Swiss-Prot record:
The keyword Cell membrane applies. InterPro entries: CD225/Dispanin_fam. The modification Phosphoserine is found at residue 137. Residues 203-228, 250-258 are extracellular. The gene is Syndig1. Its main location: membrane. Homodimer. Interacts with GRIA1 and GRIA2. Brain-specific. Expressed in Purkinje neurons in cerebellum. Also detected in the hippocampus. Found at excitatory synapses and postsynaptic cells. This is Synapse differentiation-inducing gene protein 1. It comes from Mus musculus (Mouse). One of its GO terms (cellular component) is dendritic spine. It is found in: Cell membrane; Early endosome membrane; Postsynaptic density membrane; Synapse.
Length: 258
């Protein structure tokens, strides 16, 4: 029975050792030796004695095995790998000894990146996609400019002022009350064709009433009708006067011949 327990413990310790080598974790077997007082470090250098770590008692043994305390010693070679596994892949930590050994024996496996700032294109050069530069002289540089005459700007301002004045005059004309043409209506009624003159006079009064009420649309309509009738009355009256005069002259001339 003791032989079976020892074989199982040896297998367990070998598996732990192999797992430590594969995963880069702490090796607890290769650098310790058993003695009467327990596990003792086999490092000859005194500075590694401070790396000794005393673990707590084991929770249980395989099938009723031993329960004595176990001392674990950190392996400096695998400690760096275990630390690196907690960082991202782009962060690599190396000791000074490893870097020094790289500089001495493995210098050919390293690559160096150099940043050159002298190839930046100047103001008189142009960079092509293939990395070549070409110098540009003052004659080759073309600067697109935009110019205009001051007179054009003045003409534009004049046009804007004329347009604004026209719009203001139109607004003022629309806001002005329509005229009644009362005098022209009275003249057409008394001196010209009086039926149309009377109608023009009536429409002029309707225009004044619409303006007093604030109905500018009706007032403008009445004003246009009064003006039309007054002009028509004057035209007809003038024609009548001319016809009467011609008839009178013809009559008088006929009597003289007799």
């Amino acid at each position: 029975m003791d032989g079976i327990i020892e074989q199982k413990s040896v297998l367990v310790h070998s598996k732990i050792s192999d797992a430590g080598k594969r995963n880069g974790l702490i090796n607890t077997r290769n650098f310790m030796a058993e003695s009467r007082d327990g596990l003792v470090s086999v490092y000859p250098a005194p500075q590694y004695q401070s790396h000794r770590l005393v673990a707590s008692a084991a929770p249980g043994s395989l099938e009723g095995g031993r329960s004595e305390p176990v001392q674990q010693l950190l392996d400096p070679n695998t400690l760096q790998q275990s630390v690196e596994s907690h960082y991202r892949p782009n962060i690599i930590l190396y000791s000074d000894g490893v870097l020094r050994s790289w500089g001495d024996g493995v210098a050919t496996d390293c690559c160096e990146t150099t940043f050159i700032e002298d190839r930046s294109p100047t103001k008189d050069s142009l960079e092509y996609p293939d990395g070549k530069f070409i110098d540009l002289s003052g004659d080759d540089i073309k600067i697109h400019t935009l110019s205009y005459d001051v007179e054009e700007e003045e003409e534009l301002q004049e046009l804007e002022s004329d347009y604004s004045s026209d719009t203001e005059s139109e607004d003022n004309f629309l806001m002005m009350p329509p005229r009644d043409h009362l005098g022209l209506s009275v003249f057409s009624m008394l001196c010209c064709f009086w039926p149309l003159g009377i109608a023009a006079f009536y429409l002029s009064h309707e225009t004044n009433k619409a303006v007093a009420k604030g109905d500018f649309h009706q007032a403008s309509t009445s004003s246009r009708r009064a003006l039309f009738l007054a002009v028509l009355s004057i035209t007809i009256g003038t024609g009548i006067y001319v016809g009467v005069a011609v008839a009178l002259i013809a009559y008088l001339s006929k009597n003289n011949h007799l």
